[in-house]
Amino acid sequence: HLANTEKQKYLYDHMGWDVPEYIHYGRLKMEDIALSTSKAMAGIEDGTYSGWDDPRLGTLRAIARRGIDPRTIYNLITEIGVKMADSAISWKKIYGLNRNFLEPVANRYFFCEDPQLITVGGYEGGKVDIERPLHADHMDRGNRILPFDGSAYLAKSDINDGIFRLMDAVNVNIDGGEITYHSTSFEDARSVKARIIQWVPVDDNVDVKIVMDDASIKTGLGEGALRDLKVGDIVQFERVGFARLDEIADDELIFYFAHK
């Protein structure tokens, strides 16, 4: 580093030696993540980490497994450049750059963590097929079909008192755990400032596991259209975030979470 350079130069000048060329560069640091190879290896050996692609590590393998596009890292390093001082990288910056690449390619799907089966009392609309675009900005990709007959799975965290709109389906009133039909139109939902939440069909769903960036796991149900994916595909779970399909195990899809 610079201090040692001055000391070495003083010694070389004093001894009459040719002063070598000094090359200085700073270290790259990331917030709240392990970049030390020795510490990562020790953690892998003692079982703290599952491997070099554990989501808690800052290795290229780890961030690629989560769905961070290679162009994001290239653009980030190019923007930072070579500096003598250390540089700190924030996840907020990485996610912001990566979102530019994922947003146009990631199709949208529903996922409900810790799903709870609900039945809408007073609903008389019969069974209908709800069509929702895979991507609102790319209508040429087609629609997903979500069957609805008055029952659905909701994320446990979304079941609170108030008026809610099940996306593109119906508006419901939740009062003390009792769920009743309120109305159907989006205009009605907007007039009462209803919160809009995702849901998963009772008759067409698949088990989903999402490995988060801290290695914790979210489990739940996703819509049946997820079965059309292949390993490596990146999706956006509405109201949850971007995730990369890592493994298809029996009838369970295992994703790695990228970011919101």
Language-model features: locations:
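Catalytic adenosine-cofactor/nucleotide-binding cores of aminoacyl-tRNA synthetases and other
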Residues: 1-260
